[in-house]
Structure formats: structure tokens, C-alpha cells
Amino acid sequence: MGMLVDEGKIKWEDRVIDYLPEYQLYDPTTTRELRILDLFLHNSGVGNADYLWTFMDIPAKEMLDRMRLVKPSYSLRSSFIYQNLFYVAAGEVIEKVSGKPWEAFIQEKIFTPLGMNRTAPKRKYIKDNNQVVPHYEVNKKIKPITYTQDHAIGSAGSVWSSAEDMAKWMICMLDSSKYAGGRLLKPATWAKMFKPATLVPDAEFYPTQQLTHPNWTTYALGWFQQDYKGKKINFHTGSLAGLTAIHAQLPDYKLGIYVFGNFDHAEVRHALMYKAFDWFALDGTTDWNKDFLNLYSKIFAKVEKGEKDFEAKRVMNTSPSLPLADYTGKYSDPLYGEFEITLKDNTLLIDLNHFEKAMLEHWHYNTFRGPYEKDWYGKATANFILDATGKVSKIDFEGMELTK
């Protein structure tokens, strides 16, 4: 986007609806006032809507169309909440202004000039058979899993790269976007990318703050920021199921680090980041590996305890209000799509938008619970809601309510 700003084709202060007039949000004021800059700052007030690509396979334009149904968590620019789909919207703006799909634009403007020959904007464009395999821990065992579909999320996080190519990108960013043949951005535009723009509250920052104790945490154009040992650091993680990454900078020392992992939420990435800063610039003997292992072990233990507490609240010896066949059928919602429930071998099966499935066994009363087909998703919980006549009228599936 900064390149288009430098070319005079767009301004950071321009309204999004002037480029995407069909892009409507739940709050008309936010729709009217949302600026290009806001797309990168997670300050719109619109809550997380990742279910639009984790529970369905729909084109980017349809995902954005459904955003009009996502209720805001707060008013525009009044706080911070992470929202991937605004980066999808930014990709659509880039296509509208440049006349090229986002993936073609970054290939031409970034990957090719930097010689990033083993980098692809989406996995389907990878020509190399030597590809990472994602892994997940399921039932205390680590197993390979299938790739997350990335064709719709595009500009929100679908770039695939190699260690060598990421080094080229990192060096370019540390050197004010310069490369052998010129520079990607004008100096002022490059500087704007790293200028703090939004305060990040503790609840929205990484748990690492419990160990590094930053005095401030901010967000710039695609970068989390904090102070560490009196110095500003810029960094960002990346995660798809079974895959992790982190890219960080210590600008005062022209030091950068990147970590790729083929295991879901391999938080050693944070330990390596701070250890690299200590080793190569800021000194320090902190055993970040031990400290982060202890921190995240407690976090994971808390999650596990929550699951056990949920299991313990099950009311035994209850029965569903209706015959299982009465729970079958199609349930729909303009935002969440269509779920279909069928009955097989006395067990309910749910199909989520023809994208994912789960087995639902009776839990208690009119609540059913069971494993997803992709077992690394864990277990699904569905509560059926009856109307005044005693018939099933709705389903509440993991907080998503659909009508029969």
C-alpha cells in the first residue's frame, strides 16, 4: 500500500468506501469514516471474524461482504482488537487501485526486485517440492496435519518463503527498504510503517510481557512494538495451524531475527527472539528458554484445566428432549453460513459449510459434544434451542447461533 501512496495513487487518509463502495460494516459511522490507514492498525472496533475462513471456504469478496453482519466490540479507534480480515480488505484495495491482483502486485513489486525466488504469495504457486509439513499435538502425541487453506485470506497471511529469502526481506527492511536496484519505499513512507499508531492494551498483547515487563506496547503498520532494555523493538508473529513464525527488529543496532517453526504455537520463537537481542546487542544472561517454557506451560495447563472443569460440569443421567432425528436438518445464518446435521448409527453428524465435520454425541439435556474430523481442532459443543412448541428452532455451535 505504501508503494501506491508513493506513486500518488492513494492516500493513507482516504476513505475505504471510496475504493470499495460495496464494503459495508455493521456500524454505518465506521463504514463512512474508516480510512486506508485503519485497515492496518486493528483499531476499527470490529471483533475477530476468523471463522469466515476457518469454518468455511468462501472467496475474499464474500468474506468482506459478510463483515457487515459482525457486531463491533467498541467504537472506531477507541481501542485495539486483532482483526485479520481488514488486511484482506487492504488486498482488495490494492487490486482496485493497481489493477492487479494482490499476489501479482507483490510478486512484481517486492519478490522479484529483492530476488526472493523461493517465495510465493500463496501455497498453490510454490514450485519447489521441498515444503514444510505442519505438525500439531493431539492427545499428547505430535502428528503431521493437513495444510490450512490460504487462497482466500491472501493478504492477511498467505506468503510462503524460505530462510534465505526472508533474510533478503529482513535486510531490506532494516536498511530503510533499500536494495541493490534502488528502494521499495520513499524514506518518509518507510518511516511511517514503524511509527507507533495504536496503543495495545495488556489483554491484547503477548503473554511474554509477563517476563519482559515493557513500559509501553504499541502497534504500527503491521508491527507490534515494545521497549526492551530501553530500546524499541518491532516484531510480529505469524500462525497457521501447525506452523509458526516470528520476525523481529532491533532498529538501533540494525539487527533482525526471524524464526520459522513447523509445530503449532511453538513459542520458543519468542525465546529465540529475546535471546538473539541479548547475544548480539544488549547483553544479558537470562535463560529465556527456561522462562518461556515455564510461562507457556502454565498457560497451557490453565487451558487444560478449563477443559477438565467443563467436563466436570456435565450433568449425568440426562436425556435429550426429543428423538435424535428431530435435531437433524439444515441450520443457516447470513454470517455463519449453513450447517447440516444428519443421523448415522444413533450419532449426530454436523457438516459445517461443506468445509469441516464433527461427530456430536449426547452430552447432557439438549447439548451434544464430540470430536472434529480434523482432530487437531479438538472437540465441538452444540446446544440445541427449542421454541415454545417444543421443536428445535436454533443451534448454538461454539458461540455461533444458526436458525433451523
Q: Where are each of the predicted segments found?
A:
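Active-site helix/loop module of the DD-peptidase/beta-lactamase fold
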Residues: 3-47, 68-71, 92, 96-134, ...
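Extracellular/periplasmic catalytic domains that process cell-envelope and extracellular macromolecules
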Residues: 11, 27-33, 74, 126-128, ...
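Second-shell loop/turn segments in exported
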Residues: 24-27, 49-54, 75-79, 92-96, ...
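The feature captures the short pre-catalytic strand/loop hairpin that immediately precedes
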Residues: 61-73, 137-151, 227
